Each structure stands twice: as C-alpha cells, then as structure tokens.
C-alpha cells in the first residue's frame, strides 16, 4: 500500500480497504470456521475477559498479528499453514479487523477478510460464545 501524499481520514481509509475484502457476516463466518477457516480474535484481553471468546478462534492481539500469521515468519503460529489459508479477523465491532485483514493480504494471505460487526455482531446473532470463568 503506497503512502498517499494527501491526508486520508480513517473513514476514507476504511472504505478503500474494504473494497478489497470479501467481508463476511456472522452466520457465514460460523460456516466458514466449520469448513476450516481460521477465525482470529484480535480483541485485547479486557474485552475478551468481559465478553467471552468464540470457541475455536485463535487469539492473537492486534500488535502481534502479522508476526503470528505470516506463513514465512519465524514467529508464526502453528495455525499459519500457508498463504491459501482462509482467515477471518474478528475485532470488537468490525473496524480494526478490516485494517488487520488488509495487512494480512499484504503479507500474501489472499483469502484474509474480516467479520462485519465484529464480536458484538457474532454474539447478537446468538452464535457460540464461551463466557470466561471470571465473568460468571
């Protein structure tokens, strides 16, 4: 991604980034995970502790995402099996995840995308959530 000479606001940046993503709604993400897609939860710990986790999702905080998902990287997670891996990035409300998915695409993960509405939309759809023990 080239650096623009003109200042770009976050709304414009998000719009531009999302043009290159095939974003998925929560039910589609649930089905994709059942078919082998990797859901990656990039929310920070306080949000995960407060709201819970998506069962089976890989937790990688945003500041480590590229290092953990780069199939060629020395710090990659075992789940980072190759550039053809279908990755669905999940943040809290579906904003940061768009930027994160675009970054993964720049690393060659050409099937990376994000979850529309993030974790909050997933939970609102009644999809599985594992509530942390501390929140019970």
Predicted regions and their residues:
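Rhodanese-like catalytic fold shared by cysteine-dependent sulfurtransferases
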Residues: 1-38, 45-86, 93-136
